[in-house]
Amino acid sequence: PEERGVLPLDTFNVPRGLARAMKKHDYVVTIDTAFEGVIRACGTLTKERKETWINEQLVQLYTALFHAGHAHSIEVWSTKNELVGGLYGVSLGGAFFGESMFSRAPDASKIALVHLVEVLRGAGYILLDTQYVNEHLKQFGVEAWSKRRYMTKLEKALSASPNPSTRFSTASVRSGVASSSSVKRI
């Protein structure tokens, strides 16, 4: 495509309302503990989502990437231990390609995104590719990058080596409160 959605990690914006909401919600955020559950939830049809590109073959392929260490998920859980939000994507070098996200509770997918950015920042990632720009993502600072600008950054990101000790640790955190150095309070 001529333009690509990118969330610049150094200028990531947490909307004020979300920052307040994160202090109120009592969600637990985990990393890489329910990958298949997240991808299946992202592919579930709802009133708002009448069709999906996530079919069984893609679930199996992305799950294989997960087991190989190339795909990751951020999960958001309710106090009743229900998966209420999350996202998943593919990690190559210092680039993370966000594939899809879902929310079954207020702010759950947004909280997952905030934690993803903190993990990526802490590990030294260079690029967070969101594929496209929409109103939901704009509030966080997602920008439409030209193909040339994107390819230049992608080349650098693919040759980068993020810090393996902070890459997608299986930290468990309360919404907005960290229990791991790779995920910080926002």
Language-model regions, residue ranges each:
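N-acyltransferase acceptor-side catalytic subdomain
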Residues: 1-186
